[in-house]
Curated annotation (Swiss-Prot):
It comes from Arabidopsis thaliana (Mouse-ear cress). Keywords: Cell cycle, Cell division, Centromere, Chromosome, Cytoplasm, Cytoskeleton, Kinetochore, Mitosis, Nucleus. GO terms for cellular component: chromocenter; cytoplasm; kinetochore; kinetochore microtubule; nuclear envelope; nucleus; spindle microtubule. Expressed in actively dividing tissues, early in organ development, in young leaves, lateral root primordia and root meristems. Induction: Cell cycle regulated expression with a distinct expression peak at the G2/M boundary. The keyword Cell division applies. It is found in: Nucleus; Nucleus envelope; Chromosome; Chromosome, Centromere, Kinetochore. Residues 15-198 form the HORMA domain. This is Mitotic spindle checkpoint protein MAD2. Part of the mitotic checkpoint complex (MCC); interacts with MAD1, CDC20-1, CDC20-2 and CDC20-5. Interacts with BUBR1 at chromocenters and with BUB3.1. Interacts with EIF4B3. Required for the execution of the mitotic checkpoint which monitors the process of kinetochore-spindle attachment and delays the onset of anaphase when this process is not complete. It inhibits the activity of the anaphase promoting complex by sequestering CDC20 until all chromosomes are aligned at the metaphase plate. PANTHER family: MITOTIC SPINDLE ASSEMBLY CHECKPOINT PROTEIN MAD2, MITOTIC SPINDLE ASSEMBLY CHECKPOINT PROTEIN MAD2A. It comes from the Eukaryota. GO terms for biological process: cell division; mitotic spindle assembly checkpoint signaling; regulation of mitotic cell cycle.
Amino acid sequence: MASKTAAAKDIITLHGSAAIVSEFFCYAANSILYNRAVYPEESFVKVKKYGLPMLLIEDESVKSFMSNLTSQISEWLEAGKLQRVVLVIMSKATGEVLERWNFRIETDNEVVDKGVSREKSDKEIMREIQAIMRQVASSVTYLPCLDETCVFDVLAYTDTDVAVPFTWIESDPKLIANPQMVKLHGFDTKIHKVDTLVSYKNDEWDEEE
Protein backbone atom coordinates (compact mmCIF):
# COMPACT_ATOMS: atom_id res chain seq x y z
CA MET A 1 0.00 0.00 0.00
CA ALA A 2 1.47 3.34 -1.02
CA SER A 3 1.88 5.84 1.75
CA LYS A 4 1.62 9.58 1.39
CA THR A 5 3.95 11.94 3.19
CA ALA A 6 2.50 15.37 3.82
CA ALA A 7 4.74 18.34 4.43
CA ALA A 8 4.37 19.49 8.01
CA LYS A 9 2.58 22.78 8.36
CA ASP A 10 2.64 25.01 11.40
CA ILE A 11 -0.20 27.26 12.48
CA ILE A 12 0.78 30.91 12.04
CA THR A 13 -1.19 33.46 14.06
CA LEU A 14 -1.14 37.23 13.65
CA HIS A 15 0.78 37.61 16.91
CA GLY A 16 3.25 34.92 15.91
CA SER A 17 3.78 36.39 12.45
CA ALA A 18 4.37 39.86 13.90
CA ALA A 19 6.97 38.37 16.25
CA ILE A 20 8.74 36.59 13.37
CA VAL A 21 8.90 39.72 11.19
CA SER A 22 9.94 42.13 13.95
CA GLU A 23 12.65 39.74 15.17
CA PHE A 24 13.84 39.30 11.59
CA PHE A 25 14.22 43.05 11.21
CA CYS A 26 16.27 43.27 14.41
CA TYR A 27 18.71 40.59 13.23
CA ALA A 28 18.79 41.97 9.68
CA ALA A 29 19.53 45.49 10.97
CA ASN A 30 22.36 44.20 13.17
CA SER A 31 23.79 42.27 10.22
CA ILE A 32 23.62 45.34 7.98
CA LEU A 33 25.36 47.51 10.59
CA TYR A 34 28.11 44.89 10.90
CA ASN A 35 28.60 44.06 7.23
CA ARG A 36 28.50 47.70 6.15
CA ALA A 37 30.99 48.57 8.93
CA VAL A 38 28.77 51.25 10.47
CA TYR A 39 30.17 50.06 13.81
CA PRO A 40 33.57 48.39 14.35
CA GLU A 41 33.82 44.61 14.29
CA GLU A 42 34.68 44.41 17.99
CA SER A 43 31.32 46.02 18.85
CA PHE A 44 29.49 42.79 17.93
CA VAL A 45 29.07 39.39 19.53
CA LYS A 46 28.43 36.22 17.54
CA VAL A 47 25.23 34.23 18.14
CA LYS A 48 23.40 31.49 16.26
CA LYS A 49 20.03 32.28 14.71
CA TYR A 50 18.13 30.89 11.72
CA GLY A 51 20.71 28.09 11.63
CA LEU A 52 23.37 30.69 10.77
CA PRO A 53 26.11 32.54 12.66
CA MET A 54 24.69 36.01 13.27
CA LEU A 55 26.08 39.14 14.92
CA LEU A 56 24.45 41.37 17.50
CA ILE A 57 25.79 44.72 18.58
CA GLU A 58 26.80 45.11 22.23
CA ASP A 59 26.56 48.91 22.39
CA GLU A 60 23.91 49.52 25.06
CA SER A 61 22.34 52.56 23.38
CA VAL A 62 21.94 50.71 20.07
CA LYS A 63 20.64 47.59 21.86
CA SER A 64 18.02 49.72 23.62
CA PHE A 65 17.08 51.38 20.32
CA MET A 66 16.71 48.00 18.60
CA SER A 67 14.65 46.58 21.46
CA ASN A 68 12.22 49.50 21.40
CA LEU A 69 12.10 49.37 17.61
CA THR A 70 11.32 45.65 17.55
CA SER A 71 8.52 46.11 20.08
CA GLN A 72 6.98 48.99 18.12
CA ILE A 73 7.24 47.19 14.78
CA SER A 74 5.52 44.14 16.27
CA GLU A 75 2.68 46.32 17.60
CA TRP A 76 2.12 48.00 14.23
CA LEU A 77 2.28 44.64 12.42
CA GLU A 78 -0.39 43.15 14.67
CA ALA A 79 -2.60 46.15 13.94
CA GLY A 80 -2.00 45.76 10.19
CA LYS A 81 -0.75 49.35 10.02
CA LEU A 82 2.88 48.96 8.91
CA GLN A 83 3.69 49.31 5.20
CA ARG A 84 7.47 49.35 5.19
CA VAL A 85 10.58 49.80 7.29
CA VAL A 86 13.71 51.46 5.88
CA LEU A 87 17.17 51.37 7.42
CA VAL A 88 19.11 54.38 6.16
CA ILE A 89 22.91 54.69 6.25
CA MET A 90 24.22 58.25 6.08
CA SER A 91 27.53 60.08 6.12
CA LYS A 92 28.18 61.30 9.65
CA ALA A 93 30.01 64.37 8.35
CA THR A 94 27.51 65.57 5.75
CA GLY A 95 24.27 63.70 6.44
CA GLU A 96 24.21 62.51 2.83
CA VAL A 97 22.21 59.30 2.39
CA LEU A 98 24.46 56.53 1.06
CA GLU A 99 22.24 53.45 1.35
CA ARG A 100 18.56 52.64 1.94
CA TRP A 101 17.65 49.10 3.00
CA ASN A 102 13.95 48.91 2.19
CA PHE A 103 11.72 46.23 3.72
CA ARG A 104 8.25 46.43 2.15
CA ILE A 105 5.47 44.66 4.03
CA GLU A 106 2.18 43.31 2.68
CA THR A 107 -0.37 42.21 5.28
CA ASP A 108 -3.20 39.70 4.89
CA ASN A 109 -6.00 41.96 6.08
CA GLU A 110 -8.43 39.07 6.53
CA VAL A 111 -6.23 37.81 9.36
CA VAL A 112 -6.21 41.25 10.98
CA ASP A 113 -9.95 41.81 10.57
CA LYS A 114 -11.26 38.32 11.36
CA GLY A 115 -8.58 36.83 13.57
CA VAL A 116 -8.08 33.75 11.39
CA SER A 117 -4.77 31.90 11.23
CA ARG A 118 -2.69 30.60 8.33
CA GLU A 119 -0.48 27.56 7.81
CA LYS A 120 3.16 27.41 6.77
CA SER A 121 6.13 25.33 7.86
CA ASP A 122 8.46 27.08 10.30
CA LYS A 123 11.37 25.46 8.46
CA GLU A 124 10.22 26.95 5.16
CA ILE A 125 10.04 30.43 6.68
CA MET A 126 13.51 29.94 8.17
CA ARG A 127 14.95 28.89 4.80
CA GLU A 128 13.53 32.03 3.19
CA ILE A 129 15.01 34.22 5.94
CA GLN A 130 18.36 32.40 5.64
CA ALA A 131 18.52 33.39 1.96
CA ILE A 132 18.08 37.07 2.85
CA MET A 133 20.66 36.93 5.65
CA ARG A 134 23.21 35.32 3.33
CA GLN A 135 22.68 38.13 0.82
CA VAL A 136 23.18 40.75 3.53
CA ALA A 137 26.36 38.97 4.66
CA SER A 138 27.71 39.05 1.10
CA SER A 139 26.75 42.70 0.51
CA VAL A 140 30.41 43.70 0.28
CA THR A 141 30.48 41.90 -3.08
CA TYR A 142 27.76 44.02 -4.69
CA LEU A 143 27.77 47.32 -2.77
CA PRO A 144 30.45 50.02 -2.91
CA CYS A 145 32.76 50.40 0.05
CA LEU A 146 31.64 52.94 2.66
CA ASP A 147 34.97 54.68 3.16
CA GLU A 148 33.79 57.27 5.67
CA THR A 149 32.29 57.29 9.15
CA CYS A 150 28.57 56.57 8.92
CA VAL A 151 25.47 56.70 11.09
CA PHE A 152 22.09 55.06 10.64
CA ASP A 153 18.43 55.83 11.10
CA VAL A 154 15.22 53.83 10.73
CA LEU A 155 12.10 55.07 8.96
CA ALA A 156 8.69 53.44 9.40
CA TYR A 157 5.92 53.97 6.86
CA THR A 158 2.55 53.45 8.54
CA ASP A 159 -1.10 54.03 7.77
CA THR A 160 -2.11 57.65 8.36
CA ASP A 161 -4.49 56.77 11.19
CA VAL A 162 -1.87 55.02 13.31
CA ALA A 163 -0.95 56.34 16.75
CA VAL A 164 2.70 57.38 16.66
CA PRO A 165 4.69 57.30 19.93
CA PHE A 166 6.30 60.55 21.03
CA THR A 167 9.74 58.95 20.56
CA TRP A 168 9.12 58.92 16.78
CA ILE A 169 9.19 62.08 14.69
CA GLU A 170 8.07 62.82 11.15
CA SER A 171 10.91 62.66 8.66
CA ASP A 172 11.63 63.26 5.02
CA PRO A 173 12.07 59.98 3.08
CA LYS A 174 15.87 60.38 2.92
CA LEU A 175 16.02 59.41 -0.74
CA ILE A 176 19.08 58.94 -2.93
CA ALA A 177 19.31 60.76 -6.27
CA ASN A 178 19.76 58.38 -9.23
CA PRO A 179 20.32 55.32 -7.03
CA GLN A 180 21.47 51.90 -8.07
CA MET A 181 19.19 49.17 -6.74
CA VAL A 182 19.61 45.52 -5.84
CA LYS A 183 16.54 43.38 -5.16
CA LEU A 184 17.12 40.77 -2.49
CA HIS A 185 15.14 37.69 -1.52
CA GLY A 186 11.93 38.07 0.45
CA PHE A 187 9.97 35.87 2.83
CA ASP A 188 6.33 35.20 3.54
CA THR A 189 4.69 33.99 6.75
CA LYS A 190 1.36 33.75 4.86
CA ILE A 191 0.22 36.70 6.98
CA HIS A 192 3.05 39.16 6.36
CA LYS A 193 5.02 39.18 3.12
CA VAL A 194 8.36 41.01 3.26
CA ASP A 195 10.18 42.16 0.11
CA THR A 196 13.72 43.49 0.45
CA LEU A 197 15.51 46.03 -1.74
CA VAL A 198 18.73 47.96 -1.16
CA SER A 199 19.41 51.19 -3.03
CA TYR A 200 22.75 52.95 -2.92
CA LYS A 201 24.55 56.04 -4.12
CA ASN A 202 26.22 55.43 -7.46
CA ASP A 203 29.53 57.29 -7.50
CA GLU A 204 30.13 56.28 -11.12
CA TRP A 205 27.56 58.87 -12.20
CA ASP A 206 29.56 61.55 -10.42
CA GLU A 207 32.77 60.40 -12.10
CA GLU A 208 31.21 60.55 -15.57
CA GLU A 209 29.93 64.09 -15.14
